[in-house]
């Protein structure tokens, strides 16, 4: 959908991606976690529900793009715009032998990152938990 400002808005059940002017920046806890995630090798980003799902595969890096912190896949051709204020908590585990990071806003599942090579490194595990200071 195109907004009056000319920006594009995409809404999926579990993740809102908004490409507009404004600050979409990470806090220190989120930045530390995603920098460690970026050193974890090739990952699979997964979001969606019963109706629509999307997967992106590659090495994920947070890069500043204008006034936002964007989650880039490999060279950034494919990327994810994130409302970081909604990424409140991360949980770590495994699923089918793959490492699994699950990102939440309250009880709402936002997205998951799978690591086909196995469990995430201890560096990542040490940084999961609450990512937002209580309001």
Question: What label would you give each PLM region?
Answer:
Residues 1-135:
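Eukaryotic intrinsically disordered, low-complexity regulatory linkers and tails enriched in Ser/Thr/Pro
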């Amino acid at each position: 959908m195109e907004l009056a400002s000319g920006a594009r808005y995409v809404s999926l059940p579990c993740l809102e991606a908004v490409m507009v002017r404004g600050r979409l920046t990470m806090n220190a806890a989120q930045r530390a976690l995603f920098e460690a995630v970026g050193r974890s090798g090739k990952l699979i980003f997964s979001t969606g529900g019963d109706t629509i799902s999307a997967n992106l595969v590659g090495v994920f890096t947070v890069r500043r793009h204008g006034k936002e912190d964007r989650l880039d896949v490999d060279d950034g051709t494919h990327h994810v715009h994130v409302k970081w204020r909604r990424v409140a908590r991360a949980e770590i585990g495994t699923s089918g032998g793959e490492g699994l990071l699950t990102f939440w806003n309250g009880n709402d599942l936002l997205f998951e990152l799978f690591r086909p090579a196995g469990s995430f490194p201890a560096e990542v595990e040490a940084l999961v938990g609450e990512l937002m200071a209580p309001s």
